[in-house]
Amino acid sequence: MLDNAIPQGFEDAVELRRKNRETVVKYMNTKGQDRLRRHELFVEDGCGGLWTTDTGSPIVIRGKDKLAEHAVWSLKCFPDWEWYNIKVFETDDPNHFWVECDGHGKILFPGYPEGYYENHFLHSFELDDGKIKRNREFMNVFQQLRALSIPVPQIKREGIPT
């Protein structure tokens, strides 16, 4: 039992929360060529990446310079990408936000036919005074495989009541 816990709600650090939320909202609403400047929202040694991959290990891009390079790659491979149905959630830590959203656009990976990619995403943002320290993206990797015309194995789940 937590009888010594003092409930604060999310009324603490109001200005810090506002500043951090503004950064998260800006990140999620950046489109087109403006994506080439999104790395400016990070601290110098910040990182971002995809935490759900076909290998089971995250793809982590570390540092502003590498994040800038990643933006060039991303714009080439996902030229018209946009996030939508964006919902931003605060946590008990004013420096940690979660986002749930959908995303869609062309997918142009070398070696694969052009595809159209749609998925549902979760993003974790850890921030420091309005700058992103770490952004982790989570999605259903099978949807990306389908968009690339890669056959997806089917799992038999007999007996699950639906």
UniProtKB/Swiss-Prot annotation:
Which InterPro entries does UniProt cross-reference here?
NTF2-like_dom_sf (IPR032710), PhzA_PhzB (IPR004964)
**What upregulates it?**
In liquid cultures (aerobic), phz2 operon is induced by quinolone signal via 2-heptyl-3-hydroxy-4-quinolone (PQS). In biofilm (microaerobic), phz2 operon is induced by quinolone signal via 4-hydroxy-2-heptylquinoline (HHQ), a precursor of PQS.
Pathway entry: Antibiotic biosynthesis; phenazine biosynthesis
Q: Which GO terms describe its biological process?
A: phenazine biosynthetic process
SUPFAM superfamilies named among the record's database cross-references? NTF2-like
Q: Mind listing the UniProt keywords for this protein, alphabetically? A: Antibiotic biosynthesis, Virulence
**SS bond partners:** none
Which domain of life, per UniProt? Bacteria
User: Which residue windows are transmembrane per the record?
Assistant: none
Write out the function statement from the record. Answer: Involved in the biosynthesis of the antibiotic phenazine, a nitrogen-containing heterocyclic molecule having important roles in virulence, competition and biological control. PhzB2 (operon phzA2B2C2E2F2G2) has a role in the biosynthesis of the phenazine during both planktonic growth and biofilm development, and in host infection during biofilm development.
Hey, which family's this protein in? Belongs to the PhzA/PhzB family.
Question: How does this polypeptide assemble, per the annotation?
Answer: Homodimer.
- Recorded protein name is Phenazine biosynthesis protein PhzB2
Query: Organism, per UniProt?
Result: Pseudomonas aeruginosa (strain ATCC 15692 / DSM 22644 / CIP 104116 / JCM 14847 / LMG 12228 / 1C / PRS 101 / PAO1)
